[in-house]
């Protein structure tokens, strides 16, 4: 991350954390990386999207639901992870409101191999529209590990506007954890951009209720 010095990064993180201590909120504030782009035409240039796994889960309350076959539902039940089987999904009967409610209830979904292909047919396009189409869950993976992976993965997606924001942590993480996550996120984002740093107008970090701190 050549353009943002370690000192700048640590200083910004300290400011964000100090701000959240001086005004304690009733909820755990998320720390967000805000990106403003330049020399980019969302109409003409390729809209990028990509995911990167951070070292520390940015949102501890991030909820994942398993849409599973029998084995995955049993594993999820044992691990106290929310889950639904194919019968429960069929009961939603493609009802748009119910599917929307399901998409709103959880932050992400995992689906067994046997179910994932059937989801558009059983649920319609609701999860996809909400940007929450399930990730694949196979039987060679440990369910808890996979859930942790989903919880620590963030997604950059270029839409029609020249600014983006992603969660990179929360205010009670250590300085080092936050710095590491921000470092990973910024480097990954810059690698997605056509002209790398030449496409970056500004970078800020801020907590949910705090003031933005400029990094670049």
Curated annotation (Swiss-Prot):
SUPFAM superfamilies: Ribosomal protein L1. CDD domains: Ribosomal_L1. It is found in: Cytoplasm. GO terms for cellular component: cytoplasm; large ribosomal subunit. GO terms for biological process: translation. Gene3D superfamilies: 3.30.190.20, 3.40.50.790. The keyword Ribonucleoprotein applies. InterPro entries: eL8/uL1-like (IPR050257), Ribosomal_uL1 (IPR002143), Ribosomal_uL1-like (IPR023674), Ribosomal_uL1/biogenesis (IPR028364), Ribosomal_uL1_3-a/b-sand (IPR016095), Ribosomal_uL1_CS (IPR023673). One of its GO terms (molecular function) is RNA binding. Keywords: Cytoplasm, Ribonucleoprotein, Ribosomal protein. Component of the large ribosomal subunit. The ribosome is a large ribonucleoprotein complex responsible for the synthesis of proteins in the cell. Belongs to the universal ribosomal protein uL1 family. Component of the large ribosomal subunit. This is Large ribosomal subunit protein uL1. The lineage of its organism: Eukaryota, Metazoa, Chordata, Craniata, Vertebrata.
